Amino acid sequence: MPRRLPFLLALLCAAPALPAAAPAPVELSGDTLDLGLSTGGNLVYRGNARVTGADFRLSADEIRLEAATDTFHARGRVVLTLAGARLLAAELTLRRRDGRFEAREVRLGSPPYFATAAEASGTRAEVTLRGARVSLGEPGPWQPTLAAAELVVLPGKGIRTAGAALGVGDFRPLALRGARHDFDQPLPVSLGLGGGFRRSLGLFGEARALLPVRPGLGLGGELGIYTARGVMVGPAARYADPSADDRWNGTLSSGYIRDHGDRLTDLLGRPIAPDRGLLAWEHRQRTTGGTTIAAQLNWWSDSEVLRDFRPRAFFPVQVPDSFVEVAHPGPNSFLTFLTRLQPNRFHAVQERLPELRFDALPTPLALGIWQRGEASYARLREDPPAGGPRLAADRLDAYYALSRPWAPTPWFSFTPVLGGRLTHHANLRRGEERPGNQLRLLGEAGFDAALRLSGTFDVRDPVWKIDGLRHLLTPRLSYRHFPGADRGRGLIPRIDRQAFSTYLPPLGLGETRHLDDLRATRTFRVGLGNLLQTRDPAEGVRELLRLDLAGDLAVGPRPPEGRFAAVHTELSTRPAPWLELDALQVWSARGDGLREFNTGITLREGDRWSLRWGNNFLRRELEDYAVDGRARLREGLEFITRLQYDARRRRFNEQTYGLAFAVANTWLVTSSVSVYSGRKRESSFGFDLRVDALRF
């Protein structure tokens, strides 16, 4: 029959050895208790033997307590549970006086990490494993695994080793001279595999691996083998601040190939050379003083190298950018240094070599007046790769404005604005032309007015989870007038020029960025904002619908786009977790009708399935429709599809069908078949197989 000995007998034991050094009551129990001479006067519990303390539990087939040394000896199916970690062993010795232990044939885990070892020893603060093997997730043939002759575990903090082998299951081909990992940081190992077939590439296989070299630094490489093109290889890296502050991080990716396939021509119609390569570097940093640093470098040997070999990275951003920006906050201000480079010779880039800018944020003065300002110096260059005159200018610019908000009631506000902008262009160059220096002084006058109306409605619907409605209605009217802005327009090189945008441009002179392409402006902007909200038990307030309308009315000289160009409408609604709708509409007021219409509708049922339908319409430019779907067929297996239809050309530009499934809760395997139409460089058929890590 089980016997228990509550350890009020503190003369024998003062505390559990691993959990704490201070005395604490523990309890021993077992099926039988042996106090005979054969035990040397020691307490021996056999059969379901247990030691239970405040924050630990030890069980085994047999537990022996040596009173003279305050030592537990456990053997046979030993299990020690401590602070969320669990250790199993064939034998374990626990010395209470110094908190040290030794064990053999050890298995231990603290999710998601599990380890085995021939021997283990240490204390509560540090455990040394000999003949160790650590896996991410429960040990198995597909789990990421690290094996080491000796491994040091710092419970709750991390692990370190002087030498180890890394791989998957029993296949561990990667040797590490030394490794360290803090549990509060992402795993410093990055693995990715891919493969498939495309007519333009042939059969191909791709791999990327980053291994830890020191805390916060992973080095490795990228390898791509293409039967129709050759071998692309290059170094890769990822780095981050090893401290908990996470003050800086960055990535490096590269590749070089001697391309023996059909390379076709580049963006400018020029033949592509066989030696092809790319380099991408990104860096983000934040100092203790609040200074932020952002840098990005994208070098391509030709305009198509990323599209040919890494299309997933190409299609989201098809024009590379390279810059370094340093922003330092001051008292209600920012000082910014920006340099923008043109390392490639196939895209037009407005270079800044460099630009230094000071922004004074709105600051109150006397009588309720607010001031704001900015000043900058920029050395601008543009060398069009497709031909045309080389443009250059050194520009000194300053802007200052005063405003006086006036809100006689909570529902009405009126803010007059008065400002001025001084711009000096020097060292002008437009091809062989050398226009003289240009000095331009502009004045700005205007106002911003708004009405704020609201209403509440006692509406409840448990299906849509609506608990009352609040409608916020905000009519807005703004006006800006800055005459003479086109002065010197024919002499100033148009480097910072107006770009195409589907949204309304900034109205004020202080927000305008195309300083080399200004026009005289006298414009009213009329807007109407609608917001519908309901109570939410988790978030307090949940937004059900947002509908904004706005349009510009030009007075004075008629602009090229007309006095009332278009009405812009934006709609977003999320009335329920399973429904989302977003829309953007631009309606021309000149009798041309609909100019642009973009929508997106998403339906989902938890994690069982989701479907998104969207369209993009731009008059005389494009009209396409896209469907993205996902459905869970069973646990760990999903069906995915993407369809893109071009209504103007009456064809499917893309049809993709695939399956995604998890392996050992660690790897995501995605296989897909794609059929393309209309693309000039990609094959009409493609098969892809990708293996990505789910948990590291």
Language model regions located:
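Outer-membrane beta-barrel proteins and related beta-barrel translocases across Gram-negative bacteria
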Residues: 29, 33, 85-100, 107-128, ...
